[in-house]
Amino acid sequence: MSRHLTVDIFFDFICPWCLIGKRQLQVALLKLKENNPDVEVILSWHGVQLLPHIAAEGVPFDAFYQQRLGSHEAVRMRQSQVRQAANAVDVDIDFSNIKLMPNTAKAHQLLAMAIQFGTATQIDQLLERLFSAYFHLSEDLGNSENLLKIAQSCGFDTDVINNTLGQLNQPFNSANTGSNGVPYFIFNQRLAVAGAHPAETLYNAMLEALVTQG
């Protein structure tokens, strides 16, 4: 008899720790599949808009972080820390290539459409493409034309995409993790892990959630 493991992931596209956490989760899931092939995993992605007050057209990336962290040196140290963690999971983040801090409401609404109409493969493709658009390609995640092209590249129906994009001026109802921030993982709706932890930590949390499944 198969067992079930639900994984709720709370994230934002502009958070590098969320991309790093996604990679760690993938490694943990592969180990779970190898050691526990009877477990059926159900992933649920929940968008958290960290900066809802960012202008719809976005703001300059460098200026945003200079103001947020107070100095060029503080920004450099923070980015170095992130790059080191990203490299450990084979993710290359070139902050010098990122020009815009976007408003992510439309991107999250697009993902909500994908969750409603897409397959698990399409959902993951869209997640990867949206992360890549921001961290690797310097594309504006608040631009509807960019989002249309991204969704089309993942195989979504053009009419469904256009209908979704036509409603993107509506407010985005962001998920809430309280003071836990993102990434935030909940396993089987009972065991939570906050932050971008190593894959082994996530794997052990999965095993514990399965043991306490009842």
Indicate where each model-derived feature is located.
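Short, low-complexity, intrinsically disordered N-terminal peptides in bacterial proteins
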Residues: 1-4, 213-214
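Structured loop/turn residues at beta-strand edges in well-structured enzyme cores
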Residues: 3, 39, 180
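Short active-site neighborhood of thiol/selenol oxidoreductases, capturing the structured segment around
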Residues: 4-16, 25, 43-46
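C-terminal cap of thioredoxin/glutaredoxin-like
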Residues: 9-10, 22-34, 112-214
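The canonical Cys-X-X-Cys-His
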Residues: 15-18, 185
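Glycine-/small-residue-rich active-site loops that bind phosphorylated ligands and cofactors
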Residues: 16-17, 102, 193
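Flexible, glycine- and charge-enriched loops at secondary-structure boundaries
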Residues: 18, 72, 199
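Structural alpha/beta surface segment adjacent to cysteine/selenocysteine redox centers
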Residues: 23-133
